[in-house]
Design a protein with these regions (language model features):
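Mid-length scaffold segments of soluble, non-membrane domains
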Residues: 89-168
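Bacterial Sec-type N-terminal signal peptides, specifically the leucine/valine-rich hydrophobic h-region
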Residues: 29-30
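Bacterial N-terminal signal peptides that target proteins for export
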Residues: 2-21
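Beta-rich strand-turn-strand
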Residues: 84-86
Length: 263
């Protein structure tokens, strides 16, 4: 299989983002740019984001969710697991690179070992035999996490058309991933489109139970999903040990001793 050259990838990325912008325009025209009286500091574009969220939810309800439900109903569980594992195995090299960029040498080596074992003895990743070996459990690292590790702030929360929750930092990392992703950059158009569609459906099928819980438990699914996403990304950047938030300032403290008393 031949992969597209960098200029071709850049052009494809440009096309993808133009499609996203067009979808965003449709979302805004359909639902209007709702305004929020007091937006959260972490979500200053909440009105904008809610419009995109509504658009994504409409697309998901009309297309993705029914297709994913049918996929889960028709395709046997071992086959679905194989498909999911293959796509996960493809991402191991990108994860290993980001581990290296974060200075996690041992984790990078373990991820490369996972890729080698699953690609050979696991039939191109269909079987995740590496997870049965102590120390070779999967660890997902991406460029958004790497940028966070380097000290880049996440920036405002964003909802991307079709792709969902993100931040300015994560969106920047995701753009680079699109350019380097071997699935979306395969030269054979039919194979590329089929693999991309299958990956979307496979991932959506994995989230069916979670989406049902979200719909049933959250009074405001948008806020619930936003807060869960931001907390999850914070934990991922700091490997499960995020720094404690500074306590709010106490304005009731007494004045310093050297402050002259008021007469």
């Amino acid at each position: 299989m031949r992969f597209r050259s960098l200029p071709e990838r850049t052009a494809a990325l440009r096309t993808t983002w133009w499609c996203a912008v067009l979808a965003l325009g449709v979302a805004l025209c359909a639902s209007g740019c709702s305004t929020v009286q007091t937006p959260s500091p972490k979500d200053p574009y909440e009105g904008f984001n809610r419009s995109v969220y509504k658009f994504n939810d409409t697309v998901d309800t009309a297309v993705l969710k029914p297709v994913a439900t049918g996929y889960k109903t028709v395709v046997p569980s071992p086959v679905r697991t194989c498909v999911s594992n293959v796509f996960s195995n493809v991402g191991e090299l990108w994860s290993a690179l980001n581990s290296a960029l974060q200075g996690k040498g041992e984790e990078c080596a373990n991820t490369l070992m996972r890729f080698a074992l699953n690609s050979t003895f696991g039939f191109a990743g269909c079987l995740d035999i590496a997870s049965e070996i102590p120390g070779l459990q999967q660890r997902n690292e991406d460029l958004g996490q790497t940028l966070g590790k380097w000290g880049m702030a996440p920036g405002p929360y964003l909802v991307l058309p079709f792709f969902g929750p993100s931040t300015v930092r994560d969106a920047a990392g995701f753009s680079v991933e699109l350019v380097t992703d071997p699935v979306t950059n395969a030269d054979n158009v039919r194979a590329r489109n089929s693999a991309t569609a299958l990956r979307f459906v496979s991932r959506r099928a994995e989230l069916l139970d979670a989406s049902r819980i979200l719909e049933g438990a959250a009074l405001d699914p948008y806020s619930f999903l936003r807060d869960a996403y931001l907390q999850r990304r914070l934990n991922q950047v700091y490997d499960g040990e995020p720094p404690d938030e500074p306590p709010p300032p106490n304005y009731d403290d007494q004045a310093p001793a050297d402050t002259p008393a008021t007469k």
